[in-house]
C-alpha cells in the first residue's frame, strides 16, 4: 500500500462514542494542474492551495447538489483569489495580481484591506453568502471563525501546502462537533489536541488510514469511502462565444481587423485558447 493511492482524495470519518466528525483531503494532481498554466509567485500558490483545501472541506459538508465559491478581494498587490468547488469535488482556482508579490509575503501584505466571501449555491434554492473579515494572520484562522459563527459548532482546521517528492501538494483536515451535541465538551478538545500534532510528512505522504491510525490509534474511527478530487474548469467554446455576442457588430469587426480576422479568447482559469473568426461568430448568432 502506497501513499499515492490516496492522492487527490477526500475522506470523511466519524469518531465512535465521541460525537465528533472529521474530514481529510489531499490535492496533488488537482493542485498542480491549477498551477500549470500560470506563473504565480510562491506566496500566491500557497494561498490558492490553502483555499482549495478549505473549499474541498467545505463542499464535503454540503447535504445537497451545488457548489461553493471561496473568494478573497483586496486592495493590495493580490487583487483577487478565487476557488470554486462542487459537491462532487470538482475544483478550479485563479488569482489576479495588480502588483509585485515576493515569495515571503504574508496574507495581509498580499491582500491589504480585504474580505473573504464564501458563497454557497445549491442547484435548487436560494444562495447563501457569508463575509469574513481578514483580521487574523492566516486564512485557516479566518475560516475557523467562519465555521463557528455560521454553524455555531466547534471546528478545527489544519491546512498545509508545500512540496512532496518534488511535486506541489496541498492537504488539510477538518474536525467538527456533531450538530446533535450528544458528546462530552472535552471530546472535541481531546481530539483537536491529537489532530494538531500531525506532521507535514504524514499529511503529505501517508494514506488516510495510516495517518488516522497514527493520530488516533486509541480511538474508534469509522472511515467512509473516499471521493476523488479533480481539477475541472468547465470552460467551453460556447461559453467563450457567448461573451463575444455581448459586443456590438461594429466593435467585433474592429477587433477582428486588429487581430488578422481571428479573435483569441483564452480561459483565465485553465489557459485554453478558443479562436473565433467572422464565420464562427455568425454561426453563434444563428444558434441564439
From Swiss-Prot:
Disulfide bonds: 233-235, 267-270
One term under GO cellular component: cytoplasm
InterPro entries linked: Heat_shock_Hsp33 (IPR000397), Heat_shock_Hsp33_C (IPR016154), Heat_shock_Hsp33_N (IPR016153), Hsp33_helix_hairpin_bin_dom_sf (IPR023212)
CDD domains: Hsp33
Record bears the keyword Cytoplasm: yes
One of the protein's GO biological processes: protein refolding
Keywords: Chaperone, Cytoplasm, Disulfide bond, Redox-active center, Zinc
PTM comment: Under oxidizing conditions two disulfide bonds are formed involving the reactive cysteines. Under reducing conditions zinc is bound to the reactive cysteines and the protein is inactive.
Molecular functions per Gene Ontology: protein folding chaperone; unfolded protein binding
Subcellular location: Cytoplasm
PANTHER family: 33 KDA CHAPERONIN
Similarity comment: Belongs to the HSP33 family.
General function of this protein: Redox regulated molecular chaperone. Protects both thermally unfolding and oxidatively damaged proteins from irreversible aggregation. Plays an important role in the bacterial defense system toward oxidative stress.
Record protein name field: 33 kDa chaperonin
Record lineage: Bacteria, Pseudomonadati, Pseudomonadota, Gammaproteobacteria, Pasteurellales
Amino acid at each position: 500500500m502506497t501513499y499515492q493511492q490516496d492522492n487527490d482524495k477526500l475522506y470523511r470519518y466519524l469518531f465512535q462514542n465521541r460525537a465528533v466528525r472529521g474530514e481529510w483531503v489531499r490535492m496533488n494532481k488537482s493542485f498542480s494542474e491549477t498551477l500549470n498554466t500560470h506563473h504565480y509567485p510562491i506566496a500566491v500558490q500557497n494561498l490558492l492551495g490553502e483555499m482549495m483545501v478549505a473549499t474541498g472541506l467545505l463542499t464535503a459538508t454540503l447535504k445537497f447538489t451545488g457548489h461553493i465559491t471561496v473568494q478573497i478581494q483586496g486592495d493590495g498587490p493580490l487583487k483577487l483569489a478565487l476557488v470554486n468547488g462542487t459537491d462532487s469535488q470538482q475544483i478550479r482556482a485563479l488569482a489576479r495580481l495588480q502588483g509585485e508579490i515576493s515569495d515571503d509575503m504574508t496574507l495581509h501584505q498580499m491582500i491589504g484591506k480585504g474580505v473573504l466571501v464564501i458563497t454557497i449555491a445549491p442547484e435548487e434554492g436560494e444562495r447563501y453568502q457569508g463575509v469574513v473579515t481578514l483580521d487574523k494572520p492566516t486564512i485557516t484562522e479566518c475560516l475557523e471563525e467562519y465555521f463557528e459563527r455560521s454553524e455555531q459548532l466547534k471546528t478545527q482546521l489544519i491546512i498545509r501546502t508545500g512540496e512532496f517528492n518534488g511535486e506541489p501538494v496541498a492537504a488539510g483536515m477538518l474536525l467538527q462537533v456533531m450538530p446533535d451535541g450528544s458528546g462530552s465538551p472535552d471530546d472535541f478538545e481531546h481530539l483537536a489536541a491529537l489532530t494538531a500534532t500531525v506532521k507535514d510528512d504524514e499529511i503529505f505522504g501517508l494514506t488516510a488510514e495510516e495517518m488516522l491510525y497514527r493520530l488516533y490509534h486509541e480511538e474508534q474511527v469509522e472511515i467512509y469511502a473516499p471521493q476523488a478530487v479533480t481539477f475541472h474548469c468547465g470552460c467551453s467554446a460556447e461559453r467563450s462565444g457567448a461573451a463575444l455576442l455581448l459586443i456590438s457588430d461594429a466593435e467585433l469587426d474592429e477587433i477582428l481587423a486588429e487581430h488578422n480576422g481571428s479573435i483569441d479568447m483564452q480561459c483565465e482559469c485553465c489557459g485554453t485558447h478558443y479562436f473565433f473568426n467572422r464565420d464562427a461568430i455568425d454561426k453563434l448568432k444563428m444558434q441564439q
